[in-house]
Structure formats: structure tokens, C-alpha cells
Amino acid sequence: MIQQESRLKVADNTGAKELLTIRVLGGSGRRYAGLGDVIVATVKDAIPGGNVKKGDVVKAVIVRTRKNTRRTDGSYIKFDENAAVILKNDGDPRGTRIFGPVGRELRDKKFMKIISLAPEVL
């Protein structure tokens, strides 16, 4: 469950290390974001020489959450951290590598490029 002001780890090689959520996209009064949801965030921490700088406003998709996510078969999945992947305007990832596992829910939300780059899909 990601909401406004939530801090997330960045799971790609764009140069950003931490994001702060500004807004959850997908409805005027939407409060929470889960796996596969898109957010608007700002970069709070970045490495020098990266593609994104501290203070940049970016769109990102949630790939891991600490909160349990219920699946259609009745099972639940949760991760050890909250993480996101930074997106371009067309919905493709801005980085060329994804670090760590991602949820299968991204396949249902049509983020196939992230699924193909991820080392593990749970």
C-alpha cells in the first residue's frame, strides 16, 4: 500500500536510489497504490552521472510492496521492501536493467518490457 509521501527504493539502473510519492494515478480520489499501479514521484536520492537527478519529477510503476497482495487464486504475496521502476512517457522503463524480483501482477497490467528485463517474476 503506497500512498502520498511514501518512500520507495528504485529497482532499475537509471541512477536514482530513492523516490518520494507525490500522487497515485488512476482516479481523482485514489489513495493507495499496489503492485502494477503507476505513481508520480520525485527523486530524493541519486548517484552522480545517472540518467535522473535529485529533484526530478518522474512517473514510476510499483514492482514490490511490503503489504500483502491478494491474488485471484486466493494466495497472497508480499516482499521485503517497497520498490518501483521509473518509466518513460510511453510506459516503457527508462533503465535497461531491473534489480530484484517483480510481481506477476505487472503481466496483467501490460508491463511486458519490465517482465522481460526482470531476473525473477513471482
From Swiss-Prot:
GO terms for molecular function: large ribosomal subunit rRNA binding; structural constituent of ribosome. Keywords: Ribonucleoprotein, Ribosomal protein, RNA-binding, rRNA-binding. InterPro entries: Ribosomal_uL14 (IPR000218), Ribosomal_uL14_bac-type (IPR005745), Ribosomal_uL14_CS (IPR019972), Ribosomal_uL14_sf (IPR036853). It comes from the Bacteria. GO terms for cellular component: cytosolic large ribosomal subunit. Gene3D superfamilies: Ribosomal protein L14. One of its GO terms (biological process) is translation. Disulfide bonds: none annotated. Binds to 23S rRNA. Forms part of two intersubunit bridges in the 70S ribosome. NCBIfam families: rplN_bact. Belongs to the universal ribosomal protein uL14 family. Part of the 50S ribosomal subunit. Forms a cluster with proteins L3 and L19. In the 70S ribosome, L14 and L19 interact and together make contacts with the 16S rRNA in bridges B5 and B8. This is Large ribosomal subunit protein uL14. The lineage of its organism: Bacteria, Bacillati, Actinomycetota, Actinomycetes, Micrococcales.
